[in-house]
Amino acid sequence: MKLIVGLGNPGNEYRFTRHNAGFLAIDKICEKLNISLNKEKFNGEFAVSDGFILAKPLTYMNKSGDFVYSIASFYKINPSDIIVIYDDLSFSIGQAAIKIGGSSAGHKGIERLMSKFSSNDFKRIRVGIGVNSGTTIKDYVLSLFTKDEMIVVEEVLEKVADAAISLVYNDVNFVMNKFNTDNKKRVI
């Protein structure tokens, strides 16, 4: 069993903010697979499908690791079988990449996951939200995408959704080679 989890903040006021790239990716996967997150437990919402669980924490970003740890423990999912989709300030909008392990790079949601699991062994799909220009990081990640940015974000989320689904059924190196080559080059 694999766990695909998107990080973000709950509530409509955050729905289309940069920090909710992970939630937007989960929405895209649900749309592609005609799945709805129909279970609520562990302070999150999720759906159990054939071979994987699709999930969103209902906590704020900085506490999202609590939900991920609880659901993974309940379903006996190892960190190496977790796929986390989240926003990344170091990538331009339209860029995305799969990564295994590494540091949190200051991302509070990833820091919490690493702390809860005492591991960084999970797979990550990093979705570019653009480089902060002249505002605080908090204000930037909580800002809305512009209309033009959202068009590009929608395009990359299609590929992110396909990559996440592919990671459930295929070798991570195969998926990384295919996805990372295509998506790290794109710049808005």
UniProtKB/Swiss-Prot annotation:
It holds the Pfam family Pept_tRNA_hydro. The record marks D87 as: Stabilizes the basic form of H active site to accept a proton. Keywords: Cytoplasm, Hydrolase, RNA-binding, tRNA-binding. The active site is at H19. Monomer. PANTHER family: PEPTIDYL-TRNA HYDROLASE. This is Peptidyl-tRNA hydrolase. It comes from Mycoplasmopsis agalactiae (strain NCTC 10123 / CIP 59.7 / PG2) (Mycoplasma agalactiae). The lineage of its organism: Bacteria, Bacillati, Mycoplasmatota, Mycoplasmoidales, Metamycoplasmataceae.
